[in-house]
Amino acid sequence: IKKYALISVFDKSNLKFLCNNLIKHNIGFVSTGSTCDKIRDLGFKCQEISKLTKVKEMLDGRIKSLNHKVHASILYKRTSLSHQKSFKKLNFPKIDYVIVNLYPFKKTQDSTLDKNKIIDMIDIGGPAMLRSAAKNFESVTTICSPTDYKKFINNLNINKGITSIKFRKLMASKIFEHTSKYDSLISTWLKEKKLTKKIKLKYGENP
């Protein structure tokens, strides 16, 4: 069965380097919206998730990858016959690599007071995919930052198209640390007390 990388990235830096090296190992691409468009613009074939799931993106992009087929492809145990049978019925590509970076919540929070813009940067589908892949680290490799692309490709090259279990565990630990910090930033923002004007004072007066 051909292996696929699910790529969904807000930060599209070094995407050409990543794709160029993945195709050398006969790894296909599955992606969402703008990332899929970017991969195609770079000259690579890419299957769009919404076409594979037969469920269109909805709610202005809030629902893209939250689909049971996507997560089954990431989470199923490769060593379990019952899991293999269930997955086969879905007729969905086998995802062995999940490369996702999250919406820039902190950067947006620091650059605007617009509540709606900040809320839009609370990523839901991205963390879900990363955590699914990290849970199944025995079979699936997960990457959350372009800074890890070179390490990832080097590990693939050394091991002739697969990553080592040591590398997968290391990346999985990074995912849970990363998503935990991301959630903490959101939680802190939600708890912040907004300053409001209580008394209108004349210039020079003290309350």
Q: Language-model segments: which ranges?
A:
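Glycine-rich nucleotide/cofactor/substrate-binding loop typically near the N-terminus or early
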Residues: 34-105
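N-terminal glycine-/serine-/threonine-rich phosphate-binding loop
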Residues: 1-29, 34-52
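Short acidic, glycine/serine/threonine-rich loops at helix termini
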Residues: 17-19, 40-44, 57-61, 108-113, ...
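Short coil/turn connectors at secondary-structure junctions
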Residues: 1-4, 24-27, 42-45, 68-71, ...
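Active-site loops and adjacent core secondary-structure elements that bind or stabilize anionic groups
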Residues: 151-155, 163-207
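Generic structural signal for well-ordered, non-membrane alpha-helical segments
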Residues: 11, 15, 32, 67, ...
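General beta-strand structural signal in soluble alpha/beta enzymes
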Residues: 7-8, 28-33, 47-51, 76, ...
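A short, charged helix-loop
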Residues: 97-120, 124-163
